[in-house]
Amino acid sequence: MIISVEELKQFITTDKADLVLEVRLQALEQLIRKYTNNRFHQKPYVRIKANVIAGNFVTDDVIPFKVDDTIQVSIGADATDCGIYTIKNVDGQTFTVKEDVPDMANATVTKVSYGNDVKMGVINLMEWDLNNRHKVGVQSETLSRHSVTYFNMDGDNSLMGYPKSLLGFLKPYMKARF
């Protein structure tokens, strides 16, 4: 994940369940990766070859990952993407991930690393999501002499369900699509 639920709670106060926040963070990670067309592989590449047997990654290499690192698993000569996973446990020559993973032979496991600007951008998106998502579609509210006008989320003002101004941090990470 880009940021853990514990890290998020240091910046945002919310009464949402940890599982709900984790799912939203995973959805934001997928959204950002698809939108930017960027895999965010750590440079220089930190990768190993491993076999996946009954959910355990087994390798002869030194494991360069630690608990809660994000990894991308790919397979084959064309590096077919098999998904992104979060490290759950590292033990000697094996490690496990939090998500279910199918058995595969000779998989390439690459560490995914996000910069602090991406982490802060995700925090801002989550804060907007928690505080303003329910107001989308409401232009204004008036009660007696008190009137409140909300940000307009139509047409050119929004992108992927978020205000464009909150997504500016992704511009340096955009990669061309061919």
Where are the regions that the model predicts?
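Conserved short "hinge" loops at termini or chain/domain junctions
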Residues: 1-120, 133, 156-178
